[in-house]
Design a protein with these regions (language model features):
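Short, charged/polar surface micro-motifs in flexible loops or helix N-caps
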Residues: 50-54, 74, 83, 98-100, ...
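Ligand-binding loop in jelly-roll beta-barrel domains
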Residues: 38, 96-122
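Conserved short histidine dyad/triad with adjacent acidic residue
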Residues: 29-30, 45-61, 99
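Conserved small/polar residues in nucleotide/adenosyl-binding loops
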Residues: 125-126
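Short acidic-glycine-tyrosine-enriched beta hairpin
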Residues: 80-97
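A short, N-terminal "cap"/entry segment at the start of jelly-roll beta-barrel domains
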Residues: 1-41, 51
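Short, conserved beta-strand element in jelly-roll/cupin
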Residues: 46-50, 60-78, 117-119
Length: 126
């Protein structure tokens, strides 16, 4: 099954965040592509942010490397060093164990989408 049909993977906007933090990600929809396709060592999430949507609360990872690949639209990467606009084809990488709190925010007037990929280390802490 090399080619993945995204429409065959359940899309959700569920969150584990309690209020008031959950409302920040209410305009986020995502598909857990890695889990749905049987990847055991890589996590992959396809995410769509509606205008005003956040990808998550700002966070960083112990034991997990992460890469974000912008697919469509425009999002603002918010991190410790400031803010950077990401457009289709742009990449952002986050090395494990570097305390750089980050997330994406859609400040544009249309949806944007990206893929986030990380290594699945069972000892990791987010």
């Amino acid at each position: 099954m090399p080619k993945v049909d995204l429409s065959s993977i359940e899309e959700t906007n569920s969150t584990g965040y309690p209020e008031p933090y959950a409302s920040d990600v209410a305009r986020r929809r995502y598909r857990r592509v890695g889990a749905a396709t049987g990847l055991a060592r890589l996590g992959m999430t396809h995410c769509t942010l509606e205008p005003g949507g956040w990808s998550s609360q700002r966070h960083w990872h112990e034991g997990i490397d992460e890469i974000v690949i912008m697919l469509d639209g425009e999002a603002v990467l918010v991190e410790n060093d400031g803010e950077t606009v990401l457009r289709p084809g742009d990449l952002a990488t986050f090395a494990a164990d570097v305390a750089n709190g980050h997330h994406l925010v859609n400040r544009s007037s249309r949806n944007c989408s990206f893929v986030a990929i990380d290594n699945r280390d069972r000892k990791s802490v987010v």
